[in-house]
Each structure stands twice: as C-alpha cells, then as structure tokens.
Amino acid sequence: MLDIKFIRENPDIVKENIKKKFQDEKLPLVDEVIELDSQRRANIQEADQLRSDRNRLSKQVGMLMGQAKKDPSKLAEAEAVKKQVTDEAERLAALEKLEAELDEKVHHIMLQIPQIIDPSVPIGPDDSANVEVQRFGEAKVPDFPIPYHTDIRESFDGIDMDAAGRVSGSGFYYLLGDIARLHEAVLAYGRDFMISKGFTYCIPPFMIHGNVVEGVMSQTDMDAMMYKIEGEDLYLIGTSEHSMIGRFIDQIIPAEKLPQTLTSYSPCFRKEKGSHGIEERGVYRIHQFEKQEMIVVCKPEDSKAWYDKLWNFSVELFRSMDIPVRQLECCSGDLADLKVKSCDIEAWSPRQQKYFEVCSCSNLGDAQARRLRIRYKDENGKMQLCHTLNNTCVAPPRMLIAFLENNLQADGTVKIPEVLWPYMGGTKVLVPTKK
C-alpha cells in the first residue's frame, strides 16, 4: 500500500507503474482516490473548525449561565448559545459519520493500488516473461528413466494418497516410513541451516486475525488462498511469513534491534484456487504442507542487501543437497501487488528435463509495514516505516520432488547427501521396499 501523499503528489508515476503491471483496469482508481482524499481532508478541516467553535461556545454558555444568576436577562442569551452548541454537535456527528465513510472508501481503493516496483524488474505481462539470471550446479541428464515423483515415494511405501482422498479429499496425503523421515529431516536441516545464518528460530501461531491477513497480502490472494474459520475472526495461515510479520503489528522497533531475522516451521493451508489448481495424483500443489520460512524486518536502506542474502541462502541450501537450481527474476506482471521485487529459485527435474519453482524470495518494501504500522525511529528521532522481506527456506513435499529425482540411483535407491546423515540417524541410502 502506497502513501496517499505520494499518490496525491505523483499520480503519473503511480499510473505508469500500474501500466507496467498490465493492470490498466486499475488506472481510474488513482483519480478516484485522489478525489475522495480531497473530500476527506476538506471534511476533516470543517470538523476541526466545528470542534473549535463548539469548545468556544461551550465555555461561553458556562460564562453566561454564571452571569444569569445575577442578571436574569443573560439567561435567554445563554439558551440561544446552547442551541447553537446543539446544532453544531449534530453537524459534527454528521461530519464524523461522513469521515468514517470516506476513510473506508479511501482505504478500500488504496489496498488495490500496487506497490511501486523496483526499476530493475523486467517488464512483462505474466510468468512467461520471467528472466533467468543464473544457474548453479550442472543439470543432470540420467541414463535411466526417472519415475514420476509419487511413484518414487510409493516404491518406498512412503505415501498413501488414496487413503488421504477417502479421509480428506484431493490435495492431501499420508507420508510414511523413510519418506516421512526424509520429510522431517529436510525441515530440521533447513531450520539449523537458518539458525547458523544468525536467524532466530520461531514457532508462530497457525491461525491469525483478518486484519493481519489484510496487512500481509492482497485481497485477491487472500480470497484465492486462505481458509477462514467459520464464525471466528481467524484464518489458517498459508505460510508462516504471515504470522511472523504479524508479530510486529503496531510495534515501534528500537533502531538498534533492527534487523529482526526470524525463521519458522509451520504447517501451511491453501485453497490453491486459480489456473494451476490441485494436482490429483501428485504433491506439487496441495491443500496442506509443511514449510521452513525466513523473514527479515529491516531499515529501508538495508532491504536490497538482505534480498540478495536471502535468495543466496536458498541456493546454498539446495546445492548442499546436490540439487541444481537457477534464479529466475519475476517480471512486473508476475509480481503480487505488495511486492517491489521478487525472484524464484527453481530446482532441476531430471525426469521432466526442466526447472520448477521451489522457493520464492520477495522484497515488499514498506507495503506490509505501512498496512501493519511496523515502524522504528531513525537517528533524528523521526518515525520511519520498516521494510519487510521473506523467502522460502525449504517446503517439502515439493522440494522432495527435486531431491528424490536428483538423488535417485539406477537401482531405485536414493542417495542421502552427507548434510542430512545426522537427521536420518546415519542412514546414507534409502532402499525401496518394492520394485
């Protein structure tokens, strides 16, 4: 969400940014919100004047009533002024009601106007225009067929989607045995990896209030992703980023305590509505999964450096498990409205001979901080908005698609990278239970 003052003073910049994001249907919103804001400010000015007049007249009534005790002729004058106070109170009540209505209209439009994107963001309408930046690790071309990722899991008796379908419907799964152990191992490794980078480990609430949801994501994303608890002002989190950022709502963080760096484990719950939908047989898009996430709350001047650190953490983590990856810069049309800049880290799939998304790293500038009122005082004592960033650390089971395919051997066994040995009880190779 942008500062209304910025929109008022730079409407052309805001409109050009909307065009860059291929959201021309939002262009009229800029002039509309400027007009509503003008009405709101005029309304506030009139209301302030009425309050001043009312206070002055109220004092005058008290003075006249005192004088009326000695001079009854003052009583009529006092009653006339009292009537004026009553009339102004009614007018003020009407203005305050109008102010609340205008506030709501302005706020509703402000939530729809996208954040100003970074100048380095490539311009394009959708993810087809995303730009590959660099690759890390040699993409593997095996000399034996790689089974579908669910078939690999089934060879270890490691997944039961049929039972999950009977219990919960599509988009759910049971993980079993060595595959379940591997799932927990990569989460634990991701946790310790981030702790080694100086992040504080956090287990956050898995349900959050609606005002926090509104503070961390757009209404469109909210409707497409979030499950609401019936009869409660609570939503199941789609990612722990939401509740970790929400921890700082309405906080003034001492400057010396910035940056705040947190990494968290959580289950995640998503409707997964939209063009991709739920994969009936696989586990690429599902309603429930676990994830290790990372977030940063920092000073504005530090957010670009943190952005580069975060996506590099992902590369380092995946390469330590012998998974080739690439960095893909998200274009303007693929950026969510709150994001200033974003990139995907994609892992190599030997079966498909292509890369697919496993991490998403984003700099949201002051968008979330403005909505949630996350601030700090600068060296001059002036209140400033923080910047927020987030990145996926590791999100099995999707990450395990890349892991299993890249570490699968011709005999059906799966090699466990050395970094995971301590988390697998020393197990170095997984042996299938059935061919």
Language-model region placement:
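TRNA-recognition modules of translation machinery and tRNA-sensing kinases, especially anticodon-binding
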Residues: L27, R135-K435
